[in-house]
């Protein structure tokens, strides 16, 4: 027997001893005493003895994670050794090489990459300034996908709209040959719901303005901070329609623009922006698995996206998710646990530019999506998890989620009643294919202070919060994978 095999066997024996102790504690605590005698086979239940063992294993995974996981080390490595990882760039390719290497070091086998093509946008330079009435520079950043100005830039009068709805309603003559500025009132929320409401200001606004004859488009950054650090993010030009340069102002600079316009004397701004588009570039998803011993064709998917924007180092979005999910899977592997089903870790490529990796994954795996049991993604920074929800469609699935919630309660995580499909942005293509999802809701009250800015760096993350996330992911992933419970109704 080689040294590593002997070490794993020794770990396995220690783990089984620990499982027995934890199982006794769980029984005394009443966590496993309320198991129903049986659940219908149609719902895919497992027997109570197996469930008790799974719960004991999950409790140990939870406790090991909160005592210190690899999550912070992983995200620190990614953001230091690779840095920003713009979709389709050489840096994103280096990130894939990094991911394969780290997965191998963690013995997360087998490992593969699944490639796809995309058009790769690049930022080169950006500048904005007030020409009149009060000359001064403005802090701006180009939206992802924006076209350039001419080499000489463009100068125009700014017209203000307080909302996207106001721009939609404006007559063409109010917009034509002007630089459009759209404001908004994004609110700080725990669940980030305000982002979804105001996101169309960024994604749809440029084309609405262009169709009305605007020269360029400015918006207040979709963020909740008060720093002169503008927030980038993708726009979506309408196909076969005019395209105009589009930039985000930092929130303090947006305040400045609104103050100047409030005086009623007009505002003239000059913009200079250089970007480029590589028509055909490469990206890929990076995948690692722990193969199931009883039903390896059944898959529990967890993951995060590997790409990032180019302003910061992509620590919060989504290096944290990469670290959390990799560390959770590594914890299961290190424990010597082999689930009934396959656990598949997917690090999606090119999420920031339209969920391209997630769409490619759906298309490349159409033939097996019926066997995707459930999925969950970490893509909301490194804040502590505070709520668990799942869109289970079966009684047995609901019961297993309730057991997950019992084990997560000591982490400060409460069960939620919302069954809205979701689980994370990269899971939406799978949701459309009928795959159930589970969501570990993170506290996002400060997430949009940093999101898509130069301030998205690893010093903003807290190791203890990441460990709590790892604990939660390890628990739910293990329990879903080491079960034959169905979360979706039989066809």
Where are these regions (language model features)?
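Extracellular/luminal Protease-associated
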Residues: 89, 139-245, 313, 415
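His/Asp/Glu-rich mid-to-C-terminal helical/loop segments that flank catalytic regions of hydrolases
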Residues: 330, 448-491
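Noncatalytic luminal/extracellular "stalk/propeptide" segments of secretory-pathway proteins
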Residues: 47, 53-60, 76, 80-179, ...
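Metal-dependent peptidase/peptidase-like ectodomains
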Residues: 135-137, 244-247, 254-255, 295, ...
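Short helix-loop-beta-strand segments that form the rim/entrance of peptidase-like active sites
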Residues: 73, 330-356
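N-terminal capping segment at the start of a domain
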Residues: 49, 53-89, 229-234, 307, ...
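Second-shell loop/turn segments in exported
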Residues: 58-65, 80-91, 156-161, 190-206, ...
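Soluble metallo-hydrolase cores and metallopeptidase-like ectodomains found primarily
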Residues: 56-57, 132-172, 235-315, 327-330, ...
């Amino acid at each position: 027997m080689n040294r590593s095999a002997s070490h794993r066997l020794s770990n396995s024996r220690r783990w089984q001893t620990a499982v027995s102790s934890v199982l006794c504690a769980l029984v005394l605590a009443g966590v496993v005493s309320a198991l129903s005698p049986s659940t219908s086979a149609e719902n895919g239940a497992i027997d109570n003895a197996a469930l008790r063992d799974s719960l004991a294993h999950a409790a140990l995974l939870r406790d090991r994670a909160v005592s210190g996981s690899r999550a912070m080390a992983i995200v620190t490595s990614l953001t230091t050794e690779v840095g920003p990882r713009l979709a389709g760039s050489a840096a994103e390719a280096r990130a894939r090489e990094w991911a394969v290497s780290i997965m191998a070091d963690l013995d997360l086998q087998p490992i593969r990459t699944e490639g796809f093509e995309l058009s790769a946008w690049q930022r080169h330079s950006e500048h904005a300034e007030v020409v009149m009435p009060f000359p001064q520079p403005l802090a701006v950043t180009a939206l992802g996908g924006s076209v350039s100005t001419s080499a000489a830039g463009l100068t125009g009068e700014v017209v203000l709209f307080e909302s996207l709805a106001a721009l939609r309603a404006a007559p063409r003559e109010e917009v034509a040959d002007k630089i459009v500025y759209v404001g908004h009132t994004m609110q700080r929320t725990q669940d980030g719901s305000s982002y979804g409401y105001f996101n169309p200001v960024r994604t749809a606004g440029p084309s609405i303005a262009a169709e009305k004859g605007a020269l360029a488009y400015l918006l207040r950054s979709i963020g909740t901070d008060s720093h002169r650090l503008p927030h980038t993010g993708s726009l979506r030009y309408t196909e076969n329609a005019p395209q105009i340069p589009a930039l985000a102002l930092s929130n303090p600079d947006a305040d400045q623009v609104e103050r100047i316009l409030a005086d009623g004397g007009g505002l003239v701004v000059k913009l200079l922006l250089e970007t480029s588009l590589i028509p055909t570039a490469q990206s890929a998803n990076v995948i690692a698995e722990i193969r199931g011993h009883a039903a390896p064709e059944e898959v529990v998917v967890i993951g995060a996206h590997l790409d990032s924007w180019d302003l910061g180092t992509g620590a919060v979005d989504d290096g944290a998710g990469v670290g959390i999910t990799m560390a959770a899977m590594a914890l299961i592997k290190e424990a010597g646990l082999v689930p009934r089903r396959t656990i598949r870790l997917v690090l999606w490529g090119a999420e920031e530019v339209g969920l391209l990796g997630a769409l490619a994954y759906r298309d490349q795996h159409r033939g097996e999506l019926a066997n995707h049991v459930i999925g969950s993604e970490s893509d909301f920074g490194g804040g502590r998890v505070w709520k668990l929800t799942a869109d289970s469609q079966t009684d047995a699935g609901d019961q297993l989620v309730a057991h997950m919630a019992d084990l997560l309660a000591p982490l400060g995580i409460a069960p939620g009643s919302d069954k809205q499909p979701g689980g994370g942005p990269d899971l939406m293509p799978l949701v459309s294919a009928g795959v159930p999802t589970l969501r570990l809701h993170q506290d996002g009250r400060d997430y949009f202070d940093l999101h898509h800015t130069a301030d998205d760096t690893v010093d903003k993350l807290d190791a203890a919060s990441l460990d709590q996330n790892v604990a939660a992911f390890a628990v739910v992933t293990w329990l879903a994978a080491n079960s034959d419970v169905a979360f979706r109704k039989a066809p």
